[in-house]
Structure formats: structure tokens, C-alpha cells
């Protein structure tokens, strides 16, 4: 009886949907159905279904244009297109993050770090914006050699290194619309032995650091990070650290 029921269901499906009518899901709300490319339930007029492909988050290209969230990106015509990584792409010697052009990016040294960060010989980028626009916010000494530490991207907190330094980088909201990256060199740390413990604590082979500053009172051998993110050693727990317990070299 069960087999007969399944056969009836299958026949009903085939009767209502031809084999050639099954929609092809591209991803991120893009699909192809009956020779048309769709974003959600809207037909994207003029998109070539034979060359349409997803190249990043909600980014679609065919042989002529690039689309973001179903809208054609203005002033972009496919010429010498190259996908650089998830969300980053190059066209006509210009580099883009999603639908935004990265102004003044150095094409020869540009390298994607992950889906939201990239670098060239001059800057590190978050999306299409540099993270170090002003020396007042801190600078990465050698962006071309910059890389994130393992487990070094934790929400708005970043840990990275170049050939000179280890960096603690914090993205801080200044108001409802603006945020800035504050970049701090972690002074005195052994950059070949550094380990990220969580967004607040890192360590090397000798010391524990809190938000990029050495934690003088911590007992290195017994220090551990608790499940709630706080620190603890044999002497005390570290739920809140006043400024006088930090030390800059």
C-alpha cells in the first residue's frame, strides 16, 4: 500500500511540473526558471541564464554585468573580470567589495584575507574601507605582511600580526552611524608564540595579556579562560579589570 501511495504522489508531481520546468537554485535568493533569472520572485531582465553565477554574498554576474541583491551595479561592464575571493572582485583594473569600489587600492599587491577583509601594500581593508585612515587611531606598520592570528576574528575584536608587531584591533561604535577601528601594538609580546584565548585575553610563552596589555597580576601557569569568557588563576578571577591592573611597556 505504501509503495502504491508513493507512486501516485510521484505521478501527480510529474503531471503538474514538467521535468524541464524545475527551477535551478543559484543561491542567495537567485534562481533560474524557464530561461529567466530571478532574484526572489522578480525577473532580472537581460541576465544571461547560461553564464549567470554567484560570486559572493548576493553577488551575481553573467557575461556582461554584475548584480548585487538583484540590482545591476552601475558603470560596470564585464571586461577582464577576475574573482579575487568571496565578495572581492576585479574588473577593468578596479577592485570591488560586493557592490562598492575600493578607492585607491593597489592592484598589484592586493590580497584577500577572508570574505570581509583584504590588504595591499598600503592598508588593511574592512569591506571597502581602510581600517587605519588616521594615525590618531593607530597604524599597522607593514600592511603587506599583515595576517590574522588563528581564531583572531571575534566579532568586533581582531588580533593580527605583520612582520614587526602583534596588533589588538577593536571596532568601536561612536554613535548610531559611525564606527572606527582602534589599532594597538601589543608591546613586548613574543609574536612567534602568541595564542588567542578569547576576545579579551591572549598569551605568549611568558605572559597573559588583556585587551593588548600585559596583565601583571596573572599567574601564568594556572591562568585559564572560563566558559563565560572571564579569566581565572589560582589567586583570583578576572571579571573586571581596572586600568591600574594593566601596563603598557
Model regions and ranges:
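Classical Sec-dependent N-terminal signal peptides that target proteins to the secretory pathway
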Residues: 1-21
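Non-catalytic tandem-repeat scaffold regions and their flanking low-complexity/translocation tails
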Residues: 19-249
Amino acid at each position: 500500500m505504501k509503495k502504491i501511495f508513493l507512486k501516485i504522489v510521484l505521478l501527480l508531481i510529474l503531471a503538474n511540473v514538467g521535468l524541464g520546468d524545475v527551477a535551478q537554485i543559484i543561491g542567495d535568493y537567485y534562481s533560474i526558471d524557464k530561461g529567466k533569472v530571478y532574484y526572489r520572485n522578480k525577473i532580472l531582465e537581460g541576465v544571461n541564464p547560461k553564464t549567470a553565477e554567484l560570486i559572493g554574498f548576493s553577488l551575481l554576474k553573467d557575461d556582461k554585468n554584475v548584480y548585487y541583491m538583484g540590482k545591476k551595479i552601475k558603470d560596470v561592464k564585464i571586461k577582464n573580470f577576475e574573482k579575487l575571493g568571496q565578495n572581492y572582485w576585479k574588473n577593468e583594473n578596479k577592485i570591488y567589495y560586493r557592490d562598492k569600489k575600493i578607492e585607491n587600492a593597489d592592484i598589484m599587491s592586493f590580497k584577500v584575507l577572508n570574505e570581509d577583509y583584504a590588504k595591499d601594500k598600503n592598508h588593511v581593508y574592512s569591506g571597502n574601507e581602510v581600517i587605519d585612515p588616521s594615525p590618531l587611531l593607530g597604524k599597522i606598520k607593514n600592511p603587506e605582511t599583515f595576517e590574522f592570528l588563528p581564531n583572531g576574528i571575534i566579532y568586533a575584536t581582531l588580533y593580527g600580526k605583520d612582520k614587526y608587531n602583534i596588533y589588538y584591533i577593536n571596532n568601536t561604535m561612536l554613535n548610531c552611524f559611525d564606527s572606527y577601528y582602534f589599532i594597538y601594538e601589543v608591546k613586548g609580546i613574543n609574536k612567534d608564540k602568541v595564542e588567542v584565548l578569547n576576545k579579551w585575553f591572549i598569551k605568549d610563552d611568558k605572559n597573559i595579556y588583556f585587551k593588548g596589555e600585559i596583565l601583571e597580576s596573572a599567574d601564568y601557569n594556572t591562568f585559564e579562560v572560563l566558559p563565560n569568557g572571564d579569566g581565572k588563576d589560582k589567586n583570583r578571577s578576572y571579571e573586571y579589570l581596572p586600568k591600574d591592573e594593566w601596563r603598557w611597556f
